């Protein structure tokens, strides 16, 4: 029973999203602009991502949405 309670608390915490961040993403259009260095190679990025340039590009395991929702670009690019 205790594990079930912990599971539901974690699920609710993961589903809670800052509405302001969603609005920022919606107004931005959800596209990612790559810098010249981003096109050449993908480097390790860390949370928090402030702008689209801080977020990993399409060749990385973390996505723009992951960054904008506050979960961070912490994985090594693939």
UniProtKB/Swiss-Prot annotation:
Alphabetical keyword list: Disulfide bond, Ion channel impairing toxin, Knottin, Secreted, Signal, Toxin
Tissue specificity of this protein: Expressed by the venom gland.
Subcellular location: Secreted
A GO term for molecular function: toxin activity
Top-level taxon of origin: Eukaryota
Cleaved signal peptide residues: 1-19
Cysteine disulfide links: 42-56, 49-60, 55-77, 67-73
GO annotations of cellular component type: extracellular region
Location, primary (coarse class): secreted
Similarity-based family: Belongs to the neurotoxin 13 (insecticidal toxin ABC) family. 03 (JZTX-59) subfamily.
Task performed by this protein: Probable ion channel inhibitor.
Free-text comment about domains: The presence of a 'disulfide through disulfide knot' structurally defines this protein as a knottin.
Name this polypeptide is given: U29-theraphotoxin-Cg1a
Native source species: Chilobrachys guangxiensis (Chinese earth tiger tarantula)
Lineage, broadest ranks: Eukaryota, Metazoa, Ecdysozoa, Arthropoda, Chelicerata
